[in-house]
């Protein structure tokens, strides 16, 4: 009880001081305002700042808050002081900031969402185009089985021709090798025959020369020659 009386006594000079402070402020505001604001517009702005979806709910919230504030102040459950004014001023600044900055933030958010949506749509379009191009490139290969079959037949024929060509080449190489061996054998036989003939000729010449060096053979040849000459002379007579 004593505490309640003390609070009432301390609240009276504070309220009086606040009233004396608010009087010149109101006068200055009145003198600095160029034109009075429309009460309907001001009420609409206050209602718009309150939470809620309908005007009835916003009005109920405002009336309930005002009644609670009046009840708290009248019963001195809450003492109006400088902190209350500071909180009210801060709340007003915050609400004003929300009111004026919210549209700019909404515009920024909408632009950002549009930008991201544009990027996503562009990426989706590019992806769809890439998929379509891939489908078209794959559809061009729908006859790949027939083409592969033809190429396989051609490759089989090519392998067969290559095998035949390799076989013919082996035969030609074998014939050339056989001809080379035969030619070398003929050359060897010719060289052996020539060597044998040379040896025979050399032996005959050596034998004749040895016979010519024999005096008996020389005398025999001389007698045979004289006989031949006499025979020729006899025939001439």
From Swiss-Prot:
Alphabetical list of Pfam families matching this protein: Mt_ATP-synt_B (PF05405)
Transit peptide: 1-30
Signal peptide: none
Record InterPro entries: ATP_synth_Bsub_B/MI25, ATP_synth_F0_suB
Subcellular location field: Mitochondrion; Mitochondrion inner membrane
Keyword annotations from UniProtKB, A to Z: CF(0), Hydrogen ion transport, Ion transport, Membrane, Mitochondrion, Mitochondrion inner membrane, Transit peptide, Transport
GO molecular function, one term: proton-transporting ATP synthase activity, rotational mechanism
Disulfide cross-links: none
GO cellular component: mitochondrial inner membrane; proton-transporting ATP synthase complex
Described purpose of this protein according to its UniProt entry: Mitochondrial membrane ATP synthase (F(1)F(0) ATP synthase or Complex V) produces ATP from ADP in the presence of a proton gradient across the membrane which is generated by electron transport complexes of the respiratory chain. F-type ATPases consist of two structural domains, F(1) - containing the extramembraneous catalytic core, and F(0) - containing the membrane proton channel, linked together by a central stalk and a peripheral stalk. During catalysis, ATP synthesis in the catalytic domain of F(1) is coupled via a rotary mechanism of the central stalk subunits to proton translocation.
Family assignment from sequence similarity: Belongs to the eukaryotic ATPase B chain family.
Name this protein carries in UniProt: ATP synthase subunit 4, mitochondrial
Species of provenance: Kluyveromyces lactis (strain ATCC 8585 / CBS 2359 / DSM 70799 / NBRC 1267 / NRRL Y-1140 / WM37) (Yeast)
Gene: ATP4
């Amino acid at each position: 009880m004593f505490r309640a009386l003390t609070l009432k006594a301390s609240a009276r000079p504070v309220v009086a001081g606040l009233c004396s402070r608010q009087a010149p402020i109101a006068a200055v505001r009145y003198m600095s305002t160029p034109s009075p604001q429309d009460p309907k517009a001001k009420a609409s702005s206050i209602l718009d700042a309150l939470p809620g979806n309908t005007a009835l709910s916003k009005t109920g919230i405002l009336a309930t808050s005002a009644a609670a504030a009046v009840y708290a102040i009248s019963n001195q459950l809450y003492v109006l002081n400088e902190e209350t004014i500071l909180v009210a001023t801060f709340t007003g600044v915050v609400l004003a900031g929300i009111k004026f900055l919210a549209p700019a933030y909404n515009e920024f958010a909408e632009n950002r969402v549009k930008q991201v949506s544009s990027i996503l749509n562009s990426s989706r379009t590019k992806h769809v185009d890439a998929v379509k191009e891939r489908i078209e490139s794959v559809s061009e290969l729908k006859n790949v089985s027939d083409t592969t079959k033809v190429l396989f037949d051609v490759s089989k024929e090519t392998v067969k021709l290559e095998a035949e060509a390799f076989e013919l080449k082996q035969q030609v190489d074998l014939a050339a090798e056989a001809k080379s061996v035969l030619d070398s054998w003929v050359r060897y036989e010719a060289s052996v025959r020539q060597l044998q003939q040379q040896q025979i000729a050399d032996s005959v010449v050596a034998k004749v020369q040895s016979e010519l060096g024999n005096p008996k053979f020389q005398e025999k040849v001389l007698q045979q020659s004289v006989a031949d000459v006499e025979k020729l002379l006899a025939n001439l007579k």
